[in-house]
Amino acid sequence: MRISLILVFIGPPGSGKGTQASLLSEKFSIISVGKVLRTVMESNTAEADVVKKFIKSGKLVPSNITNKIVVNALKNIDQCKSIILDGYPRDIFQADFLQENLQMDFKVLFFDIDDAVVLRRLSGRISCTDCGTIYNKLYCMPKINGVCDICNSSSFQNRVDDDESIIKLRLESYKKETLPLLEFYKAQDKLTLIDANQSTENILKKIKKISGIY
């Protein structure tokens, strides 16, 4: 691989990982596991039924499916750019798998945020039906009302996993499965904490400084 830098974004749903990845996409290739899983969910495959069942119940999708998605994405991505892994790994098993298959160093950024902020953000979230770009009815709508900034589509939808009851289940699952990664990566001196309660602009400045490529 010719990749110069890999940033791993981990944190609860709604912590702003996807927003920051989009803002950095000029210099980074983005692998958004959540976005890929939603694409799989909308496909006409047996795998789609499995993914849909887990996402609708607020649980993590099984690692055998998620790991396969990441490996395929790494094979097909533009390796002349640096990479952001958005939302992966989500548990210790996936973290071990990533280190075995990546075979190069990376930095882990943990987006730390209050549960109340997550609930407020996700309950107002919508996405473009055509390209999947995420907006928020409370603070981040398209520049032209009703028209996606990226693909000019006028079709938007509420995501199935952004229902309040499902959000709470996702947070519980995250705390159980993903929080142990903090100690895992802290012990390897890979971990940097990001206060995701801050403004988008302040978070972006910190990530740019950490990356060292701006």
Swiss-Prot record:
It comes from the Bacteria. SUPFAM superfamilies: Microbial and mitochondrial ADK, insert 'zinc finger' domain, P-loop containing nucleoside triphosphate hydrolases. Its main location: cytoplasm. Pathway: Purine metabolism; AMP biosynthesis via salvage pathway; AMP from ADP: step 1/1. One of its GO terms (cellular component) is cytoplasm. GO terms for biological process: AMP salvage. Transmembrane segments: none annotated. ATP binds at G14, S15, G16, K17, G18, T19, R125, I134, Y135, Q198. One of its GO terms (molecular function) is zinc ion binding. The keyword Metal-binding applies. The keyword Mitochondrion does not apply. It is an enzyme of class 2 (transferase). Residues 124-162 are annotated as: LID. It catalyses: AMP + ATP = 2 ADP. Residues 32-61 are annotated as: NMP. AMP binds at R38, K59, L60, V61, G87, Y88, P89, R90, Q94, R159, R170. Keywords: ATP-binding, Cytoplasm, Kinase, Metal-binding, Nucleotide biosynthesis, Nucleotide-binding, Transferase, Zinc. Monomer. Consists of three domains, a large central CORE domain and two small peripheral domains, NMPbind and LID, which undergo movements during catalysis. The LID domain closes over the site of phosphoryl transfer upon ATP binding. Assembling and dissambling the active center during each catalytic cycle provides an effective means to prevent ATP hydrolysis. Some bacteria have evolved a zinc-coordinating structure that stabilizes the LID domain. Belongs to the adenylate kinase family. This is Adenylate kinase. It comes from Orientia tsutsugamushi (strain Ikeda). The gene is adk.
